[in-house]
A protein has these predicted regions:
Chain A
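ABC-type ATPase nucleotide-binding domains, specifically the catalytic core motifs of the NBD
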Residues: 13-16, 109-122, 131
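Short coil-to-helix segment of the ABC ATPase nucleotide-binding domain corresponding to the Q-loop/switch region
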Residues: 102-110
């Protein structure tokens, strides 16, 4: 599977009018391929997250198109795009997001449970939690977890569905060195198994795992 | 775990996690449902209750011969069969004859009737003394009693001369009661039908039959029409003064019930809607995350609608029980009689409560659907 961004851009208008158009992401062409891990580096506020959200079908670009193979992501309606994202794209978001009313295990199973229910979902969620050293926290609720645990839970949630594209926004932001390695190895492994992985980070340690390295400065992406 | 089970868990867990907020929403739905079921119970029971109250103001239907011929007792009884027994609270026959009071050399109207029935059709008749029990006892209207100076336990002589004879029939009657009604009846002397038959020498004749029927105006009209249709020589008419005021009072009362119910349900909607708006704001991040993970707008709608309707279901059941208790208290205190529970009220109240809860959720759901996952996940 190939994720291709074709001249995508995102801009905002400042209060004074169109003359002050501010580009969060300038016109960019990129391609993410199966089996590769790409690391996008950049300072805070450089547009990395906006770029990732556009690739993940969460934010409509003001210009350009995002293709997954021959499918134009933003030509789909809400139901189609939601289902497509659920099936093919794994997203690790920046903050500590979890459904508070569900247990850790249920949170990990949640994306897959949205459109299907099989026992394999449970197995896969168990495996990833065990791998991240959280098997004893399966029945705990998100409010009982630390920041690092929440982060690992959200990575397990993204990986458990074996997505073809995985977009991770600062996946190691709250983690110590040991857990950073654990997570980066897991992402590397996912890429080796055929997933197209994009890691957005400002930590240079991630570069050791990358097949491609991109840099973003003030909305301009350089390869 | 199945998808449905997880959906149910999310709905119930979400409700439980926000217990205090949800309790407020639940209470407001329950109060709305209480007023709805209580007032609807009263609404349907009021005609019966008010009918019973209005029967205290006298007969609401009269039966008279349509031609010159007098009505017979048998014919009147036959006409009464049209009205169901449980609705016929009383039927009082009247025969009016001009009689002479020998000692005063004056003529008065004597009304022969059945005193037992009079008490059910004209409960407002006030008697000083007692009601007649035998055929030689009479009630004298207050006006007549004052005119001729008759007092309780006096014996008066009533006489009547049939048209075809020269001999007067005379009866000595004891005055056992003075009648006060505030109406024309105070000018009459009341005897039993038997005494009148003996005085006139003609039996089984009636001038009018007054009936007290516990039925709504339309039903009364139907009975009257049926009696008149089945018996060409008889005419049944409604006492407009009574039936009209009964209909007017009922219509006003029922409009009031509708208005109060509508206002309370509107307030319920505002309260539930405000609570659900607050819940959506609290769960903004969670909704954004679920959208990012692949939840469609439809599934977000379904979840909030599910929560709202679950509250509606609980509030509806609670409100039905409380509403019945409320209606019972009102009925006992206002009308002095209890009401029976109408089983159909439970599904109706629950469905309306769920509908109101669903309507209340429309705006919060719109807010939830409009949440932009990209903004939420960025922490904005």
């Amino acid at each position: 599977m190939i994720l291709r961004a074709e001249k995508i851009a995102k801009w905002y208008y400042r209060k004074s009018g169109e003359s002050n158009r501010f580009f969060a992401v300038s016109e960019t062409d990129v391609q993410l391929e199966s089996g590769s891990l790409t690391v996008l580096m950049g300072r805070s506020g450089s547009g990395k997250t906006t770029f990732l959200h556009m690739l993940g079908g969460l934010l409509i670009p003001d210009a350009g198109k995002v293709w997954v193979d021959d499918k134009d992501l933003y030509a789909m309606n809400d139901a189609e795009l939601s289902r497509y994202r659920n099936r093919h794209i794994g997203i690790v978001s920046q903050g500590h997001t979890a459904v508070q009313s569900l247990s850790v295990l249920e949170n990990v199973m949640l994306p897959q449970m949205m459109y299907a229910d099989t026992d394999r979902i449970n197995e896969s969620a168990d495996e990833w939690l065990a791998r991240f050293g959280m098997e004893h926290l399966q029945e705990a609720f998100p409010s009982e977890l630390s920041g690092g645990e929440l982060r690992r839970m959200s990575i397990a949630r993204a990986l458990a569905g074996k997505p073809e594209i995985l977009l991770a926004d600062e996946p190691t932001g709250d983690l110590d060195d040991e857990n950073t390695k654990l997570v980066m190895n897991a992402l590397r492994e996912a890429a080796d198994e055929g997933t197209a992985v994009l890691v957005v980070t400002h930590e240079s340690d991630a570069l050791d795992y990358a097949d491609q390295r991109w840099q973003m400065n003030a909305g301009v992406l350089t390869k | 775990m199945s998808r449905r089970k997880m959906f149910l868990k999310m709905v119930t867990a979400s409700l439980l996690r926000r217990r205090s907020r949800m309790l407020i929403a639940l209470l407001s739905i329950a109060i709305g449902a209480t007023i709805l079921s209580g007032l609807v119970t009263i609404y349907y029971d009021v005609p019966r209750q008010m009918g019973a109250q209005f029967r205290g103001y006298g007969a609401n239907m009269i039966l008279v011969p349509s031609g010159e011929e007098k009505m017979t007792v048998e014919k009147a009884q036959e006409c009464l069969t049209v009205i169901p027994k449980d609705q016929l609270l009383g039927a009082t026959p009247y025969r009016y004859v001009n009689v002479e009071m020998t000692s005063r050399q004056r003529t008065f109207v004597a009304a022969a009737t059945d005193f037992e029935q009079v008490q059910s059709t004209s409960p407002y008749f006030a008697v000083e003394g007692r009601w007649p029990e035998g055929d030689r006892e009479v009630l004298v209207g207050k006006e007549t009693a004052e005119t001729i100076g008759v007092k309780l336990n006096n014996v008066i002589e009533l006489s009547y001369k049939p048209e075809d004879t020269y001999v007067k029939n005379t009866l000595n009657m004891t005055v056992v009661g003075i009648l006060e009604t505030g109406g024309d009846e105070e000018a009459y002397i009341f005897t039993t039908l038997k005494a009148m038959d003996a005085l006139t020498g003609v039996s089984g004749q009636l001038d009018v039959m007054e009936m007290s029927v516990s039925a709504a105006s339309e039903e009364l009209e139907n009975y009257a029409a049926e009696i008149s249709e089945n018996n060409s020589d008889m005419s049944a008419r409604l006492v407009k003064r009574v039936t009209k005021s009964e209909t007017t009072v009922l219509a006003k009362l029922q409009s009031l019930v509708f208005l109060v119910t509508a206002v309370v349900l509107l307030l319920t909607m505002i309260c539930v809607s405000t609570t659900m708006m607050a819940v959506v704001s609290e769960r903004r991040k969670e909704i954004g995350l679920r959208k990012a993970l692949g939840a469609s707008d439809q599934s977000i709608r379904a979840e909030f609608l599910g929560e709202g309707m679950f509250l509606g279901l609980l509030g509806g059941i609670l409100g039905t029980a409380l509403g019945f208790a409320f209606a019972q208290v009102v009925s006992v205190n206002v009308f002095g009689s209890s009401i029976t529970f109408q089983p159909l009220l439970l599904p109706i109240t629950v469905i309306v409560s769920m509908g109101i809860a669903a309507l209340s959720c429309l705006l919060p759901i719109r807010r939830a659907v409009e949440i932009d996952p990209a903004l939420v996940l960025k922490g904005e």
